[in-house]
């Protein structure tokens, strides 16, 4: 089982923001291209417009609690963590290549916070205001704080409706700063835009993708893998942003080609397994896994694992935290448990539904120093997500699912 690794030297702290009450009168509020709502306790932020306008909406609507949470997180780590954070924020700003559209969005977030908070944007632990480089540090957290996750996809004869059903757990080291602060962000593109609209289950100010679905039903999730680090430091892209660009580029009919093209032009620091699910329409398959790292001499950094190259089962694909094509496959109890679940279902003739998919995810939830922050079942054919969230120290496996109509969330704003 993948162990979470921390050190003061590599610590990058994520800025997590929860909603705050607004004291400004309507006459003083700027025009914001976004709205914030709550469904069954989950905050849902919809944004539209230019990248900067989308960023401004995030910063303005999410309120002042982000500064307090960042301060609390840094102080919990002590002076060494604060020093490491400052070093990391400078290094990542100079090392990482950020595409202009994402840079504009991050700058917009900072502008939105300034417009909302004024002098309250100062982070006491840092003794300075929140800046653009803090957004870079936030979006590089997955490069140094590795996560252990589990996913699977079934489709066709294994599902009750003949479509695709995909499950995903995000497991990470428990930190109180992450408790009860997850949000769903819906980024709505204009009709006809080459950039697909998509939703992201995440924490505020992380603009990359950890767990997402786009308007065509394509899903992407991040998983760690022990891959090769790149020797070309001039081309590094935060992997969350590479996954986001993949999802924004992917069309259901050509997802494999679309995602591979993005990943091969965005070199990352670390090894990744990227499970992708897509609507199953009676032929082909409903899943593929992209084994992705900085070894550009092997398949230009990306090896695609499909069912044909994975196992004899023709309607199941499993993904945890080890390669199966880019390197020799290693033993993994979570991987094997999901295969056992599939074998039992096949033997019994029982087709999998959402409740059954969550039961499989429960079987592979991590424990010990890690917890499951969210557990998600995707229905790509119908563009739905079923989301379970952690609450306090209680992980997501114990919560009631929240059903999200992704198609409705992503309709262009009027």
Where are these regions (language model features)?
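Gly/Pro-rich turn-and-neighbor structural signature
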Residues: 109-111, 115-167
């Amino acid at each position: 089982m993948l162990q979470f690794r921390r050190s003061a030297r590599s610590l990058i702290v994520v800025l997590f923001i929860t909603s705050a009450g607004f004291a400004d009168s309507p006459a003083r509020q700027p025009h914001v291209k976004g709205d914030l709502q709550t469904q069954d306790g989950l905050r849902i932020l919809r944004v539209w417009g230019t990248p900067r306008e989308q960023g401004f909406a995030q910063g303005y609507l999410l309120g002042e609690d982000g500064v307090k949470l960042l301060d609390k997180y840094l102080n919990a780590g002590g002076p060494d963590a604060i020093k490491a954070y400052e070093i990391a924020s400078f290094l990542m700003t100079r090392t990482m290549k950020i595409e202009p559209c994402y840079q504009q969005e991050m700058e917009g977030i900072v502008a939105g916070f300034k417009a909302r908070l004024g002098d309250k944007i100062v982070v006491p632990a840092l003794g300075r205001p929140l800046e653009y480089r803090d957004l870079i540090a936030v979006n590089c957290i997955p490069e140094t704080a590795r996560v252990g996750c589990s996913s699977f996809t079934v489709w066709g004869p294994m599902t009750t409706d003949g479509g695709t059903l995909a499950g995903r757990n995000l497991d990470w080291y428990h930190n109180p700063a992450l408790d009860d602060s997850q949000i769903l962000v819906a980024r709505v593109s204009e009709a006809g835009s080459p950039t697909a609209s998509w939703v992201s289950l995440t924490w505020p100010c992380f603009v990359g993708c950890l767990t997402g679905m786009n308007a065509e039903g394509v899903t992407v999730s991040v998983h760690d893998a022990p891959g090769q680090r790149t020797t070309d430091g001039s081309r590094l892209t935060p992997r969350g942003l590479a996954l986001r660009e993949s999802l924004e580029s992917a069309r259901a009919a050509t997802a494999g080609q679309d995602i591979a093209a993005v990943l091969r032009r965005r070199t990352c620091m670390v090894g990744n397994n990227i499970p992708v699910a897509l609507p199953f329409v009676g032929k082909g398959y409903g899943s593929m896994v992209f084994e992705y790292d900085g070894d550009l001499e092997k398949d230009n950094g990306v090896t695609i694992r499909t069912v044909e190259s994975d196992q004899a089962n023709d309607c199941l694909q499993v993904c945890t935290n080890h390669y199966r094509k880019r390197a020799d496959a290693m033993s993994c109890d979570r991987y094997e448990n999901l295969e056992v679940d599939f074998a039992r279902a096949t033997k019994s003739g029982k087709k999998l539904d959402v409740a059954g998919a969550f039961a499989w995810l429960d079987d592979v939830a991590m424990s010990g120093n890690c917890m499951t922050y969210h557990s998600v079942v995707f229905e790509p054919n119908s563009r739905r997500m079923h989301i379970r969230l952690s609450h306090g120290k209680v992980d997501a496996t114990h919560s009631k699912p929240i059903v999200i109509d992704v198609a409705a969330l992503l309709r262009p704003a009027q």
